[in-house]
């Protein structure tokens, strides 16, 4: 049973754990030295980044002394970077319950195979996760290439933290893919149970009872899946809402920096960097929202399968089992919330885009007003100087 339950983890999150260990987000072992190394790496990276940032020994793309609005946005981006990196790593080191989540999901997968007669293959979830891994590696490489190409000290200094953000959010995307796979297997198992109920509707009660017992097993498996999702929420309780806020700040500010770089006529490499990072982060947000919406659709499909059963509805035992199952399915709906503040789905994605676009328009409008006021003040000062000059 332990070997069977390990198949799901090997097909999905095994390589992500190794990547996170290589990045210093997770310790290589459970001993004190391994955890201490992660703490030292975190504080050294954030300390060096903060010290170098506030030394101001680098080039600005805006008027740092006079453009208060741009400097405020710049400082907000840096604070979000440092706090987000610290929250993600500290949450992983202090409250890492990933083994509990993996154990629950693997146990559910084994129960579906053994009790509901589904296939023993994990090829589908492996294919889903390979797509996510491939996307992560490609985005990492593109991000590193455009960072080197732009050759700006500010972007190079933030590279390690940005890689940590992408890895943590991709871990959440992998879990969404695993849950989608389990829902698909659960629907196949539910169809097998319904087919068995139809085939045995004229059989003896002893045979019929075995089929009805599978409804109770199906109900227990769904309850275990619902509890595993709640445990997964606890695993991402702080980091997920932090990542969403960080990505919202970045995706809203990056178009503003693109606009400002075109106005200030900075290097084209900087504009390419800003546009590329914007696309990378938008893609990172879209995929898990789509997967969560698919899981919700699978949940509704699973409910409709048993809500519309018409086979042998004169049986009081079958009616009682179906009522109990439908009541549970209507209450234990699929819903993944980020820190209890927002549900992850395409509806949230639409609100995210609307807020992002609104924030971009506001930032650009502030910049236009600031530049117009600055030009007006300069022109006024020139006029005063010219009129006060001696004749």
From Swiss-Prot:
Compartments in which it is found: Cell membrane
InterPro entries (UniProt xref): 7TM_chemorcpt
Glycosylated residues in this chain: 157, 383
GO biological process: chemosensory behavior; male courtship behavior; monoatomic ion transmembrane transport; sensory perception of taste; signal transduction
Positions of transmembrane segments: 32-52, 75-95, 129-149, 174-194, 240-260, 273-293, 348-368
Disulfide bond residue pairs: none
GO MF assignments: ligand-gated monoatomic ion channel activity
A single cellular component GO annotation: plasma membrane
Taxonomic superkingdom: Eukaryota
Extracellular side: 53-74, 150-173, 261-272, 369-391
Function as written in the Swiss-Prot or TrEMBL entry: Probable gustatory receptor which mediates acceptance or avoidance behavior, depending on its substrates.
Family: Belongs to the insect chemoreceptor superfamily. Gustatory receptor (GR) family. Gr2a subfamily.
Protein name: Putative gustatory receptor 98a
Natural source organism: Drosophila melanogaster
Native organism taxonomy: Eukaryota, Metazoa, Ecdysozoa, Arthropoda, Hexapoda
């Amino acid at each position: 049973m332990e070997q069977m339950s390990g198949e799901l983890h090997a097909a999905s999150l095994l390589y992500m754990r190794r990547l996170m260990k290589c990045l210093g987000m997770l310790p290589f072992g459970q001993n004190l030295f391994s955890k201490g190394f992660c703490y030292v790496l975190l504080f050294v990276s954030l300390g060096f980044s903060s010290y170098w940032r506030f030394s101001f020994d680098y080039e600005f793309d805006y008027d740092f002394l006079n453009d208060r609005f741009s400097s405020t946005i710049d400082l907000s981006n840096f604070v979000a970077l440092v706090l987000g990196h610290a929250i993600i790593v500290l949450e992983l080191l202090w409250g890492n319950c990933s083994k509990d989540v993996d154990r629950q999901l693997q146990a559910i997968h084994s129960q579906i195979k053994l009790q509901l007669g589904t296939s023993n293959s994990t090829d589908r979830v492996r294919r889903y996760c390979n797509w996510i891994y491939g996307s992560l590696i490609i985005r990492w490489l593109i991000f590193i290439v455009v960072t080197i190409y732009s050759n700006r000290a500010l972007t190079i200094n933030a590279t390690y933290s940005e890689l940590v953000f992408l890895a943590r959010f991709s871990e959440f995307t992998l879990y969404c893919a695993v849950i989608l796979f389990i829902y698909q297997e659960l629907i196949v198992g539910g169809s097998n149970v319904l087919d068995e109920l139809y085939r045995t509707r004229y059989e003896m009660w002893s045979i019929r009872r075995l089929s009805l017992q599978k409804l109770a097993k199906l109900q227990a498996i769904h309850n275990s899946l619902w509890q595993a999702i709640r445990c997964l929420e606890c695993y991402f309780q702080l980091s997920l809402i932090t990542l969403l806020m960080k990505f919202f700040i970045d995706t809203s500010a990056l178009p503003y920096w693109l606009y400002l770089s075109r106005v200030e006529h900075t290097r084209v490499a900087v504009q390419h960097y800003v546009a590329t990072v914007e696309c990378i982060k938008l893609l990172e947000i879209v995929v898990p929202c789509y997967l969560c919406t698919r899981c919700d659709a699978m949940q509704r499909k699973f409910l409709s399968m048993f809500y519309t059963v018409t086979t042998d509805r004169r049986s009081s035992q079958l009616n009682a089992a179906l009522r109990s199952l439908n009541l549970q399915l209507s209450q234990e709906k699929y819903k993944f919330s980020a820190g209890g503040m927002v549900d992850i789905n395409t509806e949230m994605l639409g609100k995210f885009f609307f807020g992002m676009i609104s924030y971009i328009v506001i930032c650009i409008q502030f910049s236009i007003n600031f530049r117009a006021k600055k030009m007006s003040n300069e022109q006024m000062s020139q006029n005063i100087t010219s009129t006060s000059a001696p004749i």
